[in-house]
Amino acid sequence: MLPLTLSDLEGLPLGCSIVGSRCSRQQLQAHLEPWCQGDSSFDLLLLLAATRTAEREGISAAGATAASRRLTALADADLLLHGPGKPRRWPLPPLPAGVSPALLSHVALQRLPMQPLVAALGLEHEATFPHLRLESPQAGPARCLSTGRAMDPERVERLWRKGMRLGAQLRRPLLLAECVPGGTTTAQAVLKALGVPVNGLISGSARQPPQELKRHLVEQGLCRAQLPAWPSPQAVLAAVGDPFQAVAAGVLVSAQQPVLLGGGSQMAAVATLALASLPDQERKVLADRVLLGSTAWLALEWIRGGDMPALGCLLDEVGHRFGVSLAGLASGLRFHASRQPALRDYEDGFVKEGVGAGALLLLAQLQGQHSEALVEGCERALDQLLASAVASEV
């Protein structure tokens, strides 16, 4: 099976779609070139982080309860690294419907020339798998963004610097992924604080994102923070951000290689932080090496009326704010005809994205994997996951 070549890009892999409207097809072609090389290897950096924002009732579906959401990042990373058929230390939290996107990420990862690197930030439990420790476990989760003082400024500066060092050390094309329950709400706060119109553009893991609750928490946090009219990215992070955003923005600023951002609004917030930290003349340079990759379920979601789905509108708003064109693509994987009900739940608006699933699936397609084979791989992986769950109960 051969990777996609540049001559094929006029017709993207089956089902893949362009996200946003500010990036020309020629620009998109340039963005895709490093990800279509069949003889290339890539780096995957998965950042796990925690914020007390996730403990607000109804804010996130990345775990059915606040207690279970404290383990979501560890459980998802465990599944990504070890797969569904092997014993894992961290059980997956119960979900309202569907299955963890880490399962999809694992299936794609098995078909790609990359080794994952995991970093843990502010988790309440120590990871039992190999990982980068970028700060002491005693640092704990970020405070709820509604406090207006989510992190101490010293912590933000320290994490940003560590992200910059990490970004400078990684040399191959980099896929950046995250698992941060509550992270779409901190993303909404960061984007709004940095001047990006976000009303009706931020999704979440729930089938019906709690828009009013998110808006209330964001307004409460920004009111209490009393930020100046043109705050620095670091000041915004200290007020309403989370540890993932600080490290990821630092990585993005210092990385000189192509970067594939795996996700939706959380990665849009990271791109916004990075762009806001740079002088005007350097912003286009950064935008030209960044591509956002998402799932079709997130990229095609309409939250408000408009000319295009919410994620595309959000990318365009970020680009307009900083005078650049941000490129985005959605993977072509769909589960309409899957034999697995938990996978078909994705088509009904549950889960949608996470743990870099969209970017990993997109990269697998760009490297020549057919969507039918990826669907079958996800179905087999879910068979294994369900069988292992039954075995553990016996």
UniProtKB/Swiss-Prot annotation:
Example GO molecular function: nicotinate-nucleotide-dimethylbenzimidazole phosphoribosyltransferase activity
Domain of life: Bacteria
Family annotation (InterPro entries): Nict_dMeBzImd_PRibTrfase (IPR003200), Nict_dMeBzImd_PRibTrfase_arc (IPR002805), Nict_dMeBzImd_PRibTrfase_sf (IPR036087)
UniProt xrefs under NCBIfam families: PRK04447.1-2 (NF003369)
Protein family membership: Belongs to the UPF0284 family.
Designated name of the protein: UPF0284 protein SYNW1869
Native organism taxonomy: Bacteria, Bacillati, Cyanobacteriota, Cyanophyceae, Synechococcales
